[in-house]
Amino acid sequence: MSLLSDLVNLNLTDATGKIIAEYIWIGGSGMDIRSKARTLPGPVTDPSKLPKWNYDGSSTGQAAGEDSEVILYPQAIFKDPFRKGNNILVMCDAYTPAGDPIPTNKRHNAAKIFSHPDVAKEEPWYGIEQEYTLMQKDVNWPIGWPVGGYPGPQGPYYCGVGADKAIGRDIVDAHYKACLYAGIGISGINGEVMPGQWEFQVGPVEGISSGDQVWVARYLLERITEISGVIVSFDPKPVPGDWNGAGAHCNYSTKTMRNDGGLEVIKKAIGKLQLKHKEHIAAYGEGNERRLTGKHETADINTFSWGVANRGASVRVGRDTEKEGKGYFEDRRPASNMDPYVVTSMIAETTILG
């Protein structure tokens, strides 16, 4: 095993000028992440300088077998924490050979919204709180839980310390450092209310880059859990009953919200979100009705509400924002399996263009 480990960690910099680029894209379910690698002649820092590539869309549920070619367009580059050196991770979106975005390419429409002059001048910032649950590989049950049984009730696990409370911290810390190495704007991590459940935060990040970074952070988490023999679940309610679900709260602000008088702009934006509550809920993740019950720090899925420091509301305004009269708000409705391209662009579209 030592030879294998040595080869996996081999530094290519002194041996060749070539690099490895891992192309990443979203598969047919809209939640599965795919990737494959190719050799490039030298370092690349600009995604527009990278070659387009293709893959077999019939094997990802994104094309028919008789016309299976789907084209990858490189969109963002990150440093590769696994191969290190000049090797890179490349976030891509997917198109037909004719150049049309395929149905699961949600980035394309998001980029159009973020490039709208009225949106661009507002410089929308996002902070995504990505919750997830670490599951035992063969039994689909959270790590640290007795198979077929339950741990003690919630209470000691949120931000907890100790082997009986913080289950999976080695994976969480490895992911944290991998994100920092890659150049992702990860701003923190914490243990969540349900044991085996964790959260990382990405942001503040502006515009389309928020979606790119959350997707690559998810990719890194999938790779690290792959190495650890653990499954990462983004199910919004992985365990029924008196256990917290998993969300992806979206903190949001625009330039006018961050400036003096911004609180009134925030209130108007929240009013616009209320008018389109059903449309947003429909786009905020699969199975969210199991999570948004009005319990476990959620609002009821059928009712829009907002409040200051209220974690049982659809939208929360922080005490600091209220005190300073400017800042940001938190949309608490998105599920952990939401598409960040969809959620971030939809919030901008509703609050700025709506």
Curated annotation (Swiss-Prot):
Impact when changing residue 49 to Q: 3-fold increase in affinity for ammonium and catalytic efficiency
SUPFAM superfamilies: Glutamine synthetase, N-terminal domain, Glutamine synthetase/guanido kinase
Domain GS catalytic stretches: 106-354
GO molecular function: ATP binding; copper ion binding; glutamine synthetase activity; structural constituent of ribosome
Modified residues (Phosphoserine): 2, 48
Position of the signal peptide: none
Name used for this protein in its record: Glutamine synthetase cytosolic isozyme 1-3
Organism name: Arabidopsis thaliana
